[in-house]
């Protein structure tokens, strides 16, 4: 059935809420590139040089990991091959896996994301694709599918290469996708991991490299839920992180963070600055609730008792809003030719809310059954019978005339 655009009513609600509006200038962010996004909608809340080409270092590992999670089996055991270890330059982080060591996919993911063990990514790549090069092709294909515009990877782990680059915006896009996977979320939120004894090594214990989730760190945020650190001398300090507070989940990416003169870590200071800004200026607001009455109609051909019909929301509608200035509009699309009979919960249209540059739509449902008007139905039958009678008489007259 075609839909007819019907603007029933537009409501504009402007609420000015008391409270401080925390803001900052680009120079308050020490990192060369940064971005803050809402994880639910992907909306950008702050950015600084977010589309500039940057070296990602170990933040690369989130893409490697999500592909391994999606294509592998966490309980599978795989064997560490010599090539996976040999290509890791000295000085890069490692779990010192041994050639011939048998280890599960889940254990590899944990030591890869939590301890940043570079060889683990190569082991995962060979497990999934048979070779590191083939797996890297998958990485670039996945990045393209996710909408990344300026990303090109040449390895699984972020070991420096001039042709291995991305942007803060692309990493935020990848991180947002990764955080939709429950296994990924669980691993990156772990404060530590333990690799059980294997055929080549005793039990090993590793702490998460992300100080935002370390309770003993001066940068600890109780509402931080991951994700991944990174560092090379060329990339400088990097961090992708995620926080969830009061139902609002934000993702921050900072790249090229310098070492500050006071020995404080710019990647954590910048990330905390971004989260303070985000949670002081934005919130997730319930615009409307499932079952709310938003419109009322008289149904054509409905009987007197049921023809007056409320249209109710089919789902809750939540939106990211600026807490200091909420501007909400809505419009309604109703189906053509709404008439009885109608069953309760039938879909009769759509309501679309607009908040800033974001839109949210949900169905409009019938609140109750609407029955057809019996009198109208009877009249219709009588008229049909009369028409049939008239046609019969005409046919008889024509037939007699021919005789």
What are these regions (language model features)?
Residues 1-3, 47, 372, 402-403:
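Short, Lys/Arg-rich N-terminal segment immediately upstream of the first membrane anchor
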Residues 148-149, 163-165, 170, 175-402:
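Domain-terminus/edge residues, biased toward the C-terminal soluble/receptor-binding domains
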């Amino acid at each position: 059935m075609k839909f007819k655009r019907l603007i029933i009513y537009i409501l504009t609600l402007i609420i000015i809420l008391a409270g401080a509006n925390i803001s900052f200038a680009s120079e308050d962010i020490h990192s060369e590139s940064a971005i803050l996004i809402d994880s639910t909608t992907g909306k950008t809340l702050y950015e600084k040089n977010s589309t500039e080409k940057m070296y990602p270092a170990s933040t690369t590992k989130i893409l490697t990991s999500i592909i391994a999670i999606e294509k592998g089996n966490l309980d599978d055991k795989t064997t560490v091959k010599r090539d996976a270890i040999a290509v890791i330059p000295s000085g890069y982080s490692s779990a010192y896996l041994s050639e011939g060591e048998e280890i599960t996919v889940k254990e590899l993911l944990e030591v890869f994301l939590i301890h940043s063990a570079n060889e683990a990514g190569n082991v995962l790549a060979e497990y999934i694709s048979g070779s590191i090069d083939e797996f890297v092709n998958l990485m670039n294909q996945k990045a393209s599918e996710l909408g990344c515009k300026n990303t090109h990877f040449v390895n699984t782990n972020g070991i420096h290469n001039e042709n291995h680059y991305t942007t803060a915006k692309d990493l935020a896009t990848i991180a947002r996708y990764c955080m939709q996977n429950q296994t990924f979320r669980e691993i990156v939120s772990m404060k530590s991991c333990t690799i059980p004894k294997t055929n080549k090594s005793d039990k090993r214990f590793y702490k998460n490299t992300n100080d935002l989730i370390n309770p003993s760190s001066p940068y600890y945020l109780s509402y931080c839920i991951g994700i991944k650190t990174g560092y090379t001398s060329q990339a400088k300090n990097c961090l992708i992180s995620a926080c969830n507070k009061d139902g609002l989940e934000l993702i921050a990416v900072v790249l090229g963070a310098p070492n500050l003169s006071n020995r404080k870590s710019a990647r954590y200071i910048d990330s905390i600055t971004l989260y303070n800004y985000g949670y002081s200026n934005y919130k997730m607001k319930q615009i409307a609730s499932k079952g709310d009455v938003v419109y009322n109609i008289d149904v054509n051909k409905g009987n007197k008792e049921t023809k007056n019909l409320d249209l109710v929301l089919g789902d809750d509608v939540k939106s990211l809003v600026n807490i200091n200035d909420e501007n909400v509009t809505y419009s309604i699309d109703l189906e053509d030719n709404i008439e009885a009979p109608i069953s309760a919960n039938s879909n009769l249209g759509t309501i679309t809310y607009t908040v800033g540059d974001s839109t949210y739509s949900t169905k409009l449902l019938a609140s109750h059954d609407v029955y057809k008007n019996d009198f109208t139905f009877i009249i219709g039958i009588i008229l049909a019978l009369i028409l049939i009678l008239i046609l019969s008489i005409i046919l008889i007259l024509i037939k007699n005339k021919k005789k």
